[in-house]
From Swiss-Prot:
Keyword 4Fe-4S attached: yes
Temperature and thermostability: Optimum temperature is 65 degrees Celsius (with reduced methyl viologen as the electron donor). Full activity is maintained up to 60 degrees Celsius, with activity falling to 25% at 70 degrees Celsius. Substituting tungsten for molybdenum at the active site of SerA decreases the overall stability of the SerABC complex, rendering the components less thermostable.
Name of the featured protein: Selenate reductase subunit beta
GO molecular function annotation: 3 iron, 4 sulfur cluster binding; 4 iron, 4 sulfur cluster binding; electron transfer activity; metal ion binding; selenate reductase activity
Domain of life, source organism: Bacteria
Binding-site residues, [3Fe-4S] cluster: C145, C166, C172
Lineage, uppermost ranks: Bacteria, Pseudomonadati, Pseudomonadota, Betaproteobacteria, Rhodocyclales
Cofactor: [3Fe-4S] cluster; [4Fe-4S] cluster
pH dependence per the entry: Optimum pH is 6.0. Activity is also optimum at pH 6.0 in the presence of tungsten.
Localization (cell): Periplasm
Species for this entry: Thauera selenatis
Domain called 4Fe-4S ferredoxin-type: residue spans: 6-35, 124-155, 157-186
Described purpose of this protein according to its UniProt entry: Component of the selenate reductase, which catalyzes the reduction of selenate to selenite and allows anaerobic growth with selenate as the sole terminal electron acceptor. A c-type di-heme cytochrome of the cytc4 family was shown to donate electrons to the selenate reductase in vitro. SerABC can also use reduced benzyl viologen or reduced methyl viologen as an electron donor. This subunit transfers electrons from SerC to SerA. The reductase is specific for selenate, and cannot reduce nitrate, nitrite, chlorate or sulfate.
């Protein structure tokens, strides 16, 4: 059991799908040495199949009795999409081709269904869902590892893999219900998001948090009652875990999208009264607390429109870096 737990809150109402977080992580951690296909941080469009493809259907996690599920499916290479080779030499140097193309026809990738969403115009909808390792309090990957290579850091609760102990059995890949454990074929070991702990140890925020241009990411210790994590998760209860039913007690929380876009049109062309993003779709991701969270958010926004003060909206705006993260 770790002494303290670092956690994240992602405000989905502010995410613009720019992937700056993804590129920050990719350039720092996964652009070499067998990690090229890995995206420890990814931003997927929902509704959608996600990354790896259909990760929600691959099992893992714990059952209702708290027992580790052993029926998880290891994603195949195609589920992640290609890291294709291109004819750069022939095109840019030798002049044998006038077009840069991949060496094989792409059929899937990390953002293959980006911005597709669900529904038909003018009632279609989608939103962005950034995902990293949840650094769970009850990690299924840790429970599944027979060599005890996976552990939670005592000082901050980050879940990491001891590469010297990992034997490459991939039980952890099967066990993670979020599809955030990866296998490095070049090294023969499992790897994952490390919460940027080398940066954390220097007092710096993780790269994905620091580089977020939409300022959607909040980061800090769960028990810091003066910090944004505690206030959004425990005090205001507007930040919810993703698929809490998996039983891993994730430490990444999401402020659900508020349906502030116009409601869908009725058949006669008039605006209806139903939310554009169906509440049941949001509850399938974030659980039964969605309605109350949205009601709280809506109420606080209404106060601001009346020029009244709102601590919650001030927190969510996150005027400065210090307002959004720090340890």
């Amino acid at each position: 059991m770790s002494q303290r737990q670092l956690a994240y809150v992602f405000d989905l109402n502010k995410c613009i799908g720019c992937h700056t977080c993804t590129m920050a992580c990719k350039q720092l951690w996964t652009n070499r040495d067998g990690r090229e296909y890995m995206y420890w941080n990814n931003v997927e469009s929902r509704p959608g199949k996600g990354y790896p493809k259909n990760w929600e259907q691959k099992g893992g996690g714990f059952d209702k009795d708290g027992k580790l599920k052993t029926n998880g499916i290891i994603p195949i290479r195609a589920d992640y999409g290609g890291t294709w080779n291109y004819n750069l030499l022939e095109t840019l140097v030798e002049g044998k081709s006038n077009q840069v193309v991949p060496d094989e026809k792409p059929t899937w990738g990390p953002n293959w269904d980006e911005d597709e969403g669900k529904g038909e115009f003018p009632n279609n909808h989608y939103f962005y869902l950034p995902r990293i390792c949840n650094h769970c309090s009850n990690p299924a990957c840790l429970a599944a590892c027979p060599t005890k290579a996976i552990y939670k850091r005592e000082e901050d609760g980050l879940v990491v893999v001891d590469q010297s102990r990992c034997k490459g059995y991939r039980y952890c890949v099967k066990a993670c219900p979020y599809g955030k454990m990866y296998f490095n074929l070049q090294k023969g070991t499992s790897e994952k998001c490390i919460g940027c702990y080398p940066r954390v140890e220097k007092g710096e925020a993780p790269a994905c948090v620091k580089q977020c241009s939409g300022r959607i990411r909040f980061w800090g210790y769960r028990d810091d009652k003066d910090g944004p994590i505690y206030k959004l998760v425990d005090q205001w209860k507007v930040a919810l875990p993703l698929h809490a039913e998996y039983g891993t007690e994730p430490n990444v929380f999401y402020v659900p999208p508020m349906n502030t876009t116009p409601p869908p049109f009725e058949e006669d062309g008039r605006l209806g009264d139903k939310p554009r993003i169906p509440i049941e779709d949001l509850e399938a991701l974030f659980g039964p607390g969605v309605k109350q969270a949205l009601a709280t958010l809506g109420g606080e926004m209404a106060k601001r429109r009346k020029a009244q003060a709102s601590e919650l909206t001030d927190i969510l705006i996150g005027y400065t870096n210090k307002d959004r993260y720090g340890i």
